[in-house]
Structure formats: structure tokens, C-alpha cells
Amino acid sequence: YIAQINEIKSFQANITEDEKKLVSYWSAGAVLRWNEILRELVAKHNLPPYQNADGTYPFPSPNNPLAYPQFPFSNPPYAARAYAYVSAAQYDALVTAWYYKKRFNRAAPYKVDSSLQVLVPTSDLPSYPSEDAVVVGAAVEMLKMLFPGDQDFIQQKAEEHKRVRIISGANVRSDIEAGEALGRAVAQKFVTRARGDRAGAAAGNQAMWTKLETDCTARGETPWYSLELPKRPPMLPAFGKVKTFLFDSLTAVSLRPGPPPSVSSQQMKDETEEIYQMIKNPTRERTAIVHFWADGVATDTPPGHWDEIAAEDFIPKNFSEVRWARNMALLNMSLMDAAIVCWDTKNYYFNPRPTQLNPKIKTLTGIPNFPAYISGHSTFSGAAATILGHIIPERATAYDDMAREASLSRMYGGIHFRSDCEVGLTVGENVGNYAIQRATTDGAE
């Protein structure tokens, strides 16, 4: 132990300005910083593959992640799942760490040796195992699976984070090593779950894509089709079969809403005309809203946007790492389950977009390559606003307002009908309520 204390002294005696900046950066919070890194990776990989010469589209392969198209294509469902797995693994790992902290009750190095500089905020929390290293271990293990082509970058961030905790006087090396090992061990449970959660089959195949169309036609409706040239297969049409976090598969199916208005109904004609009039008469305010909530290609997606909103509100609260992790896990499990219920609904009804029913509608944002009903933005936003309103009740009205604006942005952009958006918000709220049930019964409140 004395040798480990001396290692800190050696680092501090030779500390550079760059190292001081890194200490400041990482001391903002481990869960926060790794969520930012995850959002960065999602944005980097949120790029739909370009077509082959024969008009077909290639699919990214996890077995060859650096070949074009690079794996993953982190579209909204993939991203929602990534945020959920990383957050849930970090939370469970930190809960376990808190047990061992209390059991071993090792004081922080700066409390053992007062000659050490303290370069981070002090606390009475036992230092073994290091909570930061637990977060690192869980993040690295999950991100290796989710972003296999980025392991060098991920490992470099992990080494930087661990080294900073020693330089700062917060932890000795054995605190770090124990924390990282614990984080990795807990995350392995989530890796095993992820490998069997059916996400690997979410892209479907030609037979499935054809059946979605013919089933819709058999109901007397007009099926959705890709408006891209050449036509692109629908985005992850079997994602609705992925294993949920907050409820079982029967509950997921029960959350599927009733059908959209029939394509031949007067209501659908009216809703199509409403979108056409919005597009014909855009305002600067509405156009700004469209772009603010677009969250399209090369962004961290709608779930990432809500993580960003949450993080900004969590920072002033000075939550502990385990509280941060719990909040992010509740939020991101809600967003993943919202994606699952939403994608189940989209591909069950296979309903067309406004531009398909009226080609005169010229959209103000990109047209997503999947069916309209229900709106993904609306479902994500309803779920996020609901659980965030529980976590920070004084912000509940603001979150609801944001969710409504995000939902309306898809109408203003010309890519969704009113029924897509209104029903999507309600479905999202229903999913978010399951997260509240989890929160009120997990013993942490």
C-alpha cells in the first residue's frame, strides 16, 4: 500500500498542465463522461450504407467491423439499445461496488497520507473499489461488443481515466484494478444477455419484408414502401421482437396501439392535407424546431438527444456516481423499450408516410426509411419525459413541453401524420410509466 501511495506522489511531483486538464475533465463524473463518449460513437456510426453497383444494399458485419459498411450502423433502435446496455451495466456494477465499499471501508489515499495533493472534490466514500474504475470496466466491456471497430479509442479513454484517478490522489492502483475487474465481471452478464436478445436478427430478410407488405395489402391498406432510389430494405423491421428491459414480451405486445386511420378514410385525407398545408406555409419558428429535433444521420439520435437533455439537468444536482447511473439506466431502459414497442407497431401496421400519399409534400427534413405509424421521435420523447419528470419533478412540465415539441417537429417537417405523433406520445408515456414502477419499487427512493 505504501508503494501505491508513493506512486501517487511520483505522478504528482511531475504533473503536467495537460494532466491537470485531464483531471478536471474526468472529475466532472464518470457516468457523464462515458455517456458523452458513447454519444460520440453513436454519431460517428449513424451512417446508412451506400448502395452496391447492382442496386442492392450491403449490411454491416460485426465479424468484420472495419470493412465497408462499417459496423455498426447506429440508427435510432441500435443506439437506444446501446445506451440502455451501457447504462444498465454501469448501474448494476456500481450497486455491487457500493456493497464492497461498505464492506472493506478503505479510506481514500489523501485521508491516509495528508501530504498528498487532492486534485478532485473530496468525499467520505470508501475508495475500494474505485467507482470510476467500475464505470470504466463496465463501459469498456459493453462498448467492445457494441462498437468492435473502435476498441483502440475506447481503451485509450479507459487508460486515461484510470491514470487520472491515481494522479489526482483519489485512488491507489489496487482501488482501480479491483474496480475495473468488478465492472467487467458485471458487464459480462449484460454481454451474455445482449447476445441472446434477438437484436442480431432485427434486419430480417427478403421473405419477411415481402410478408409485411402482403399482410398490409390483405387488410385492404396501402403498404409503406421505401422512397429511396434504389429502394432500401426497411430499417430493422424485426426490432420489435428484441427482449425488453422493463417488462416481458407479452406486455410489449399489449402496449401496441390500435390501428392508424385507414388510408382510404376521410380522417387520413384530412391528416394528409394538414401536413401539406404545413409544408406549403412553413414559418421560421417551425423550421427551427424541425432542425433542432431532427437528430438524423451523423447525430447521436433521438435517444442520445434525450440523454444530453438529462445530463444537463443532472449536473447541477451533484448526484453520486451510483445515483447518476441509476437515473441514466432508468432513462435509457425506457428509451430502448420505447424503440421496441414503436418498431413492433410500425412493422405490424406498415403504414405509409405523408409523402407517399401526396407526392407534392416536400419535406423539410430527411424521410426515415421505415413506416410512419407510430412516430419514433414521439414515442422516445413520451417515454423520456415521463421518467425524467419522475426523477426531477420540478422539471416535469418542461419535459412534457419538450416532448410535445419534438413530436410536432415531425409534422412540421412533413414526415409524419398527426395520428402518428399523438399516439406515439401516448405509447411512450405508457412505457415511461413502467420505468416509474421500477423506480418506486427498487429500494433506492
Pin down the residues of each PLM region:
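Acidic/polar surface patches and capping/hinge elements
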Residues: Y1-E445
